[in-house]
UniProtKB/Swiss-Prot annotation:
NCBIfam families found in the cross-reference section: PRK00816.1, rnfD
UniProt name for this protein: Ion-translocating oxidoreductase complex subunit D
Main location: membrane
Single biological process term from Gene Ontology: electron transport chain
UniProt membrane topology term: Multi-pass membrane protein
Annotated gene: rsxD
Claim: Transmembrane helix is one of the keywords in the record: yes
Cellular compartment(s): Cell inner membrane
Length: 352
């Protein structure tokens, strides 16, 4: 028998980057399906636009850097970046917005730092924030869920609105955003923040059609539950660890509960925070990015808790209704500090 001498490491992880990225893409299917059901075909069109833009942008930069295009594109990271950005923006946003945001995310937020594994900030959230700051009106023009919508665009209408701004019958975004009460609709979080600032009581706000859902708002509660299902599957597949999602959701729920108990007339109830906006998408698909999140177990708990606190503060007191993207980027800034103070002690070394 011949024994081959090899250098360490002797224990190998069989899961390559492309495999993990593929698992995340598959886990996103329930969330995508829910958004398609409640908000129409625009979500699918945005995903296709973002995916093509991400692959082309990544290929262009790799070509300029004289690196292997095919080998890098196979890791599926560009596709995941495009997907996360596409599901975060309104389904009928103009086509050039998702292209601009995706190209910025891939080229500036990822490749400019050296590519996958080198970027300090989540690329998809960088692209989202750039779009939100630059085009706030378009980025907050969400359609009402089909449960309370008057006009539900079909596949052809969705394409026409995205590329031309109006449907074949001449309808525009203002028409499509009308709810059953004849008022243009926004997300539950946006509606709550705007109504509170206008002096409406929480009891009055909860009577709006957008809050006709069982838990947290028409459509959005099921979208978040779908992303939660995908996240649980990722945990079961061991593609992500439990520390960040758990600490994020527990902290957000705790802050929301305390705030609601102390100020029920101005702050949203915990179920609205947990099941509205991008809460579950952020908890399981964005914050768990292995490149931009903390790398130690204690650090992951701190990182997730910090993000949860920031989301609640931005939603409750900030100028933006959701806040997940800003919370993720602010938490990304603290990762080097968190990792420095939570790294495990080398065996045999004493403190001091």
């Amino acid at each position: 028998m011949v024994f081959r001498i090899a250098s360490s490491p002797y224990t190998h992880n069989q899961r390559q980057t492309s495999r993990i990225m593929l698992l995340v893409l598959l886990a996103a299917v329930p969330g995508i399906a829910a958004q398609l059901w409640f908000f129409g075909w625009g979500t699918l069109v945005q995903i296709l636009l973002a995916s093509v833009s991400a692959l082309l942008a990544e290929a262009l930069v790799l070509k300029l850097r004289k690196q292997s295009v095919a080998a890098t594109l196979k890791d599926n990271s560009a596709l995941l970046t495009g997907l996360l950005l596409a599901v975060s923006i309104p389904p009928l946003a103009p086509w050039w917005m998702v292209v601009l945001g995706t190209v910025f995310a891939v080229i500036i937020a990822k490749q400019l730092y050296g590519g996958l594994g080198q970027n300090p900030f989540n690329p998809a959230m960088i692209g989202y924030v750039v779009l939100l700051i630059s085009f706030p009106v378009q980025m907050t023009s969400w359609l009402p869920p089909h449960e309370i919508a008057v006009n539900i665009p079909g596949f052809i209408d969705a394409i026409q609105v995205i590329f031309s701004g109006h449907t074949a019958s001449g309808g525009d975004m203002n028409t499509l955003r009308l709810g059953i009460d004849g008022i243009s609709q926004a997300t539950p979080l946006d509606t709550f923040k705007t109504s509170v600032r206008a002096g409406h009581s929480v009891e009055e706000i909860m009577q709006y059609p957008i809050y006709s859902g069982i838990l947290a708002g028409a459509g959005w509660q099921w979208v978040n539950l779908a992303w939660l299902a995908g996240g649980v599957w990722l945990l079961w597949q061991k593609a992500i660890r439990w520390h960040i999602p758990l600490s994020f959701l527990v902290t957000l729920a705790l802050c929301a509960t305390l705030g609601w108990l102390f100020s029920p007339d101005t702050l949203a109830a915990p179920q609205i925070h947990l099941l509205s906006g991008a809460t579950m998408l952020g908890a399981f698909f964005i914050l768990t990015d292995p490149v931009t999140a903390s790398t130690t177990n204690r650090g992951r708990l701190i990182f997730g808790a910090l993000a949860g606190l920031l989301v609640w503060m931005i939603r409750s007191f900030g100028g933006y209704p959701d806040g997940v993207a800003f919370a993720v980027l602010l938490a990304n800034i603290t990762v080097p500090l968190i990792d420095y103070y939570t790294r495990p002690r080398v065996y045999g070394h004493r403190k001091g």
